[in-house]
Amino acid sequence: MAKKEGVKKMFDNIAPEYDKLNHILSLNIDKRWRKKAVRELADEPRPLKVLDVACGTGDFTIEIAQKVAHGSEVVGVDISDGMIAVGVEKLAKLGLDVNLEVADCESLPYDDNSFDRISVGFGVRNFEHLELGLSEMYRVLAPGGKLIILELSVPSNAFIRWCYKLYFLKILPFVGGLVSGNRGAYEYLPSSVLRFPGPDKFMPMLKDAGFETVEHRSLTFGICRMYIGKKSAV
């Protein structure tokens, strides 16, 4: 089975329990990271057109929609029907006018230069073809636009890294599997983080995709990183 199909099936299966487990297992630190990213994204008073890629159940999408200027348009896409279905229910309860769509990040169904901002919250490591996904996001980003990526990473500090791996490789799969009934999904999470390129390799990939200015910020001892890529205005 291709990675894309496996990831879709896995997230379809864990979608009903995903939100509850995600916040418990991350100790709610993920909320703090998202707030930082949203501040970076919603940095202009004008209405923005925003695409949230790999939106999952819509947590990041919702925060963005609540913070951007009035009149903005926010769209979320994910490959998992199950995750999108949960997100649609959440949006309906909140009364937010946000469109969630099932779509492949490697073949986005939008015209060139369509969005002022693009976000990816903890999903870029799930791309089957990372370079293609980055190129697609660059394609649909408008000139002068900004891409903000949040992604988990391995801390550089030896003690923090030891604690991190103990939690990620032992505790998380056990608890996640116990609650969701799908231990494999919570074994995939740490393995996908360990395989994902560090800043020294990922930043050049953003450059190769076309982003003119790229930077990254380390959050919470390097457990999470925020990557920012800007498309030339001309």
Language-model regions: role of each:
Residues 49-107:
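Class I SAM-dependent methyltransferase SAM/SAH-binding core
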Residues 5, 150-205, 209, 215:
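C-terminal alpha-helical "lid/dimerization" subdomain adjacent to the S-adenosyl-L-methionine
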Residues 131-143:
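A short glycine-rich, Lys/Arg-flanked "PGG" loop and its adjoining helix->strand segment in the class I
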Residues 106-117:
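A short acidic, Gly/Pro-enriched loop at the edge of an enzyme's catalytic core
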Residues 209-234:
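Core SAM-dependent methyltransferase catalytic element
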Residues 70-71, 141-146:
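Short glycine-dipeptide loop
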Residues 18, 118-119:
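Hydrophobic beta-strand segment of the Class I
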Residues 27-48, 63:
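Conserved alpha-helix/loop element of class I SAM-dependent methyltransferases that forms part
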